């Protein structure tokens, strides 16, 4: 997910997407523990998407404007 896509979302959409990503991360971590996870890079990508969403939400709280 690109930062521009996240910035175009409403606050509610961001929160919903954040919750979806967190649930997916939990499921993938469980698969990794069991040994059924095939795409390990997916965990890293989800963690980065979560960080992007949280960063953009924090920027808006502080009034920092980006492109």
From Swiss-Prot:
GO terms for cellular component: cytosolic large ribosomal subunit. CDD domains: Ribosomal_L29_HIP. GO terms for biological process: translation. GO terms for molecular function: structural constituent of ribosome. Keywords: Ribonucleoprotein, Ribosomal protein. Pfam families: Ribosomal_L29. Belongs to the universal ribosomal protein uL29 family. This is Large ribosomal subunit protein uL29.
């Amino acid at each position: 997910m690109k930062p521009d896509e996240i910035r175009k979302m409403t606050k509610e959409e961001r929160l919903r997407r954040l919750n979806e990503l967190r649930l997916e991360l939990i499921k993938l971590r469980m698969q990794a523990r069991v040994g059924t996870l095939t795409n390990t890079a997916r965990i890293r990508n989800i963690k980065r998407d979560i960080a992007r969403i949280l960063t953009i939400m924090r920027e808006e709280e502080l009034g920092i404007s980006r492109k």
